[in-house]
């Protein structure tokens, strides 16, 4: 347990083969201190339930993460428990193709949720089982883009249940097909609490200008800018503006190791290369 640690520009893959002996909530990369910085990394093909849980007030920026939590149920890619949320800054990440939550401000099932003051912005999430799970209160969730397969959950969940949750949170300038205050229920039945204005978000539950994916230039080739004249463009919502060009992940080219040579290694042998 220590403070102000930095993990940057690193590539993690094919890890947690058994997901045994992992600490806490079953986490791939875990830190129990505070003010850790995890940025410009790539993670994929992991086994543990949660991928990143790096202590109080984490900064998680410019990472690309996919194909996670393959050996355990539940879980999230970026996981924050209640005490960890204050001062958290989760931004400019690409999170995709996983059946886990993308970014989760977590808390107890029922009872009092004391999670407060996390900021989640300018993230792109696609083909994720619920892109954002916002539990607690006084959070700011803005300029995120969520689209694609949702595994029967809402894309952005600003949770309000049992009469409590997010009454003072701000949710604005997001683009998603399904935004609500419930895991699966509609916006009509479960409207978002706190600072939420329909005209300052694109929510497929109430907007009828096509899916978020259809309004992006070329999302599966990582061009998440809005098409000119689309509703997302006209409202200036989502993670990218027309001229934005930020990229998540490492700043160097990763080339995987070559497979070992099969067969005889002696070039003078009669059976060489057979």
Model regions and ranges:
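Primarily marks secretory-pathway-exposed extracellular/lumenal segments that are disulfide-
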Residues: 254-274
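C-terminal accessory segments
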Residues: 204-260
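Right-handed parallel beta-helix
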Residues: 1-51, 55-65
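Short "repeat-start/strand-capping" segments in structured domains, especially the N-termini
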Residues: 3, 34-35, 56-59, 86, ...
């Amino acid at each position: 347990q220590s403070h102000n640690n930095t993990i940057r520009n690193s590539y993690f893959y094919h890890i947690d083969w058994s997901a045994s002996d992992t600490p806490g909530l079953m986490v791939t990369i875990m830190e129990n201190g505070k003010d850790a910085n995890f940025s410009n990394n790539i993670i994929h093909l992991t086994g543990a339930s949660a991928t990143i849980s790096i202590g109080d007030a984490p900064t998680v920026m410019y990472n690309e993460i996919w194909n996670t939590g393959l050996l355990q149920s539940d879980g999230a890619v970026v996981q924050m428990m209640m005490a960890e949320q204050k001062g958290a800054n989760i931004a400019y990440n690409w999170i995709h193709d996983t059946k886990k939550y993308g970014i989760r401000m977590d808390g107890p099932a029922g009872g009092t949720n004391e999670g407060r003051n996390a900021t989640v912005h300018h993230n792109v999430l696609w083909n994720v089982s619920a892109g954002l799970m916002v539990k607690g209160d006084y959070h700011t969730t803005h300029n995120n883009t969520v689209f694609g397969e949702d595994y029967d959950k809402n894309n952005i969940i600003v949770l309000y249940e049992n009469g409590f949750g997010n009454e003072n949170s701000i949710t604005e300038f997001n683009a998603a097909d399904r935004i609500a205050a419930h895991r699966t229920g509609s916006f009509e039945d479960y409207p978002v609490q706190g600072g939420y204005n329909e005209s300052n978000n694109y929510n497929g539950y109430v907007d009828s200008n096509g899916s978020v994916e259809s309004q992006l230039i070329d999302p599966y080739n990582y061009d998440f800018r809005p098409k000119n004249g689309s509703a997302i463009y006209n409202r200036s919502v989502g993670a990218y503006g027309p001229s934005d060009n930020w990229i998540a992940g490492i700043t160097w080219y990763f080339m995987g190791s070559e497979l070992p040579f099969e067969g005889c290694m002696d070039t003078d042998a009669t059976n060489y290369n057979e």
